[in-house]
UniProtKB/Swiss-Prot annotation:
GO biological process: hydrogen peroxide catabolic process
GO annotation, cellular component aspect: blood microparticle; haptoglobin-hemoglobin complex; hemoglobin complex
Similarity field: Belongs to the globin family.
Entry keyword annotation includes Heme: yes
Name of the protein described by the UniProt record: Hemoglobin subunit alpha-D
Biological source species: Phasianus colchicus colchicus (Black-necked pheasant)
Length: 141
């Protein structure tokens, strides 16, 4: 699915985003909750207002998991296994939500990376986030 050039583009782009995990993650979550309000049902115990400590903390976790995925791009299933178990068996998150969050992450990256978020980077990230979403949904089968 991901070729060598895709992996290179993902790693280069992620180097620019990695130091902004909390900020970008929180922004992606707020975008998701705004664009897809049904996703709020998975967070009944959270203060969902933009900038809340819970949103910022979870945003950092989400992008931290993506950092792990970038580092382990050739072994996503093993790297994301624990997270897949958590979302499938404990949290019971509908897998469609992974795609919704992926879209929001792509928007945040595009906004903040500007001209560095080229069509090639976009295509590589789209494939990468699709692969991550598929791995997270593996345990549902």
């Amino acid at each position: 699915m991901l070729n060598a050039e895709d992996k290179k583009l993902i790693q280069q782009a992620w180097e620019k985003a990695a130091s902004h995990q909390q900020e970008f993650g929180a922004e992606a979550l707020v975008r998701m909750f705004t664009a897809y309000p049904q996703t709020k049902t998975y967070f009944p115990h959270f203060d969902l207002s933009p900038g809340s400590d819970q949103i910022r903390g979870h945003g950092k976790k989400v992008l931290g998991a993506l950092s792990n995925a970038v580092k382990n791009v050739d072994n996503l299933s093993q790297a994301m296994s624990e997270l897949s178990n958590l979302h499938a068996y404990n949290l019971r998150v509908d897998p469609v939500n992974f795609k919704l969050l992926s879209q929001c992450i792509e928007v945040v990256l595009a906004v903040h990376m500007g001209k560095d978020y080229t069509p090639e980077v976009h295509a590589a990230f789209d494939k990468f986030l699709s692969a991550v979403s598929a791995v997270l949904a593996e345990k549902y089968r």
